[in-house]
């Protein structure tokens, strides 16, 4: 979950649904849904980070869902997604495509967090 510095926009990852939701939180007592961004089949958005200028939302797509015996039922698509953020919209940036299933050449990596310099 991430919120803008002014507190007017809230972003929530819906892990098992494969979606990121954007709310208008200008009135925190009555948040309004702005956008539901569907990341597609087998996605599992987990960690969200806003760039410093708050124009992009970086989404790590790895959410591990295990049962009591350790069997994995869902773990996301191992990608990093970037969405363009505006006042009233959240749009996937199709120019950005970092797929950790193939990026390292020896199998899937599991992106978990994000750090900006």
What is each of the regions a protein language model found here?
Residues 22-31, 82-93:
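Short loop/turn segments immediately following beta-strands, especially the blade-tip
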Residues 36-41, 95-99, 105:
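Surface loop/turn motifs at the tips and blade-to-blade linkers of beta-strand repeat domains
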Residues 47, 111-113:
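Conserved beta-strand position repeated once per blade in WD40 beta-propeller domains
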Residues 60-80:
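Short, conserved, GDST-rich strand-edge loop motifs in beta-rich repeat architectures
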Residues 6-8, 53-55:
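Short coil/turn segments that connect the beta-strands within blades of beta-propeller domains
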């Amino acid at each position: 979950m991430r919120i803008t510095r002014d507190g007017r926009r809230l972003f929530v990852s819906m892990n098992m649904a494969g979606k990121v939701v954007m709310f208008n939180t200008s009135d925190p007592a009555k948040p309004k849904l702005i956008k539901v961004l569907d990341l597609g089949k087998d996605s599992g958005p987990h960690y969200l980070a806003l760039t410093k200028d708050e124009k992009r939302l970086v989404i790590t797509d790895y959410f591990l869902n295990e049962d009591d015996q350790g069997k994995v039922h869902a773990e996301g698509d191992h990608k990093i997604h970037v969405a363009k953020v505006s006042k009233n919209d959240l749009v996937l940036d199709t120019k950005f495509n970092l797929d950790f299933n193939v990026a390292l050449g020896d199998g899937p990596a599991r992106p978990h967090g994000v750090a900006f310099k």
